[in-house]
């Protein structure tokens, strides 16, 4: 299973031309894995400040991936997930969510509610990227 997964990622990254396939796979998959398994990622924990920093890291990683994939052949699953991830982190940034107390509880404050939605969307879409790209564990 792991060999097949590594082959899929290597072929995906080879097709994108983002460098030496094994090195690019290690770097990009490692970054996706780290963000996915972080406290604000799949664990749904972390302080508001941690989660704001986490979204900034997801945003940076997403922009780098999108840039490296421009004009390249990329698997459909991955090419569909990246724009959704860019939208989710963009919503977080647009609402200036790093300035509010973002968490997972419901809020009557409209801005906090939008920030909670953006955080949850970012987690969900990053999970989709993690699984659609078959990032090795």
Description of each model-found segment:
Residues 8-12, 122:
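Hydrophobic alpha-helical membrane segments, chiefly transmembrane helices and signal peptide h-regions
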Residues 13-17:
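C-terminal motif of bacterial Sec signal peptides marking the signal peptidase cleavage site
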Residues 7-8, 127:
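General helical structural elements
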Residues 1-7:
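Bacterial N-terminal signal peptides that target proteins for export
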Residues 54-118:
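Long, amphipathic, charge-rich alpha-helical segments that form helical bundles/coiled-coils
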Residues 28-46, 91-137:
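C-terminal amphipathic alpha-helix
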């Amino acid at each position: 299973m792991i060999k097949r997964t590594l082959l899929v990622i290597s072929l995906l990254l080879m097709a994108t031309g983002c460098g030496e396939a094994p090195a690019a796979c290690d770097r990009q998959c490692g970054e996706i894995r780290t963000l996915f398994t972080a406290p604000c990622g799949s664990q749904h924990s972390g302080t508001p400040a941690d989660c704001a920093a986490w979204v900034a890291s997801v945003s940076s990683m997403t922009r780098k991936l999108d840039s490296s994939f421009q004009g390249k052949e990329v698997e459909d699953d991955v090419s569909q997930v990246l724009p959704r991830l860019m939208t989710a982190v963009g919503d977080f940034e647009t609402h200036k969510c790093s300035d509010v107390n973002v968490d997972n509880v419901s809020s009557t404050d409209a801005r906090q509610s939008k920030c909670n939605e953006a955080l949850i969307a970012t987690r969900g879409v990053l999970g989709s990227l993690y699984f659609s790209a078959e990032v090795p564990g």
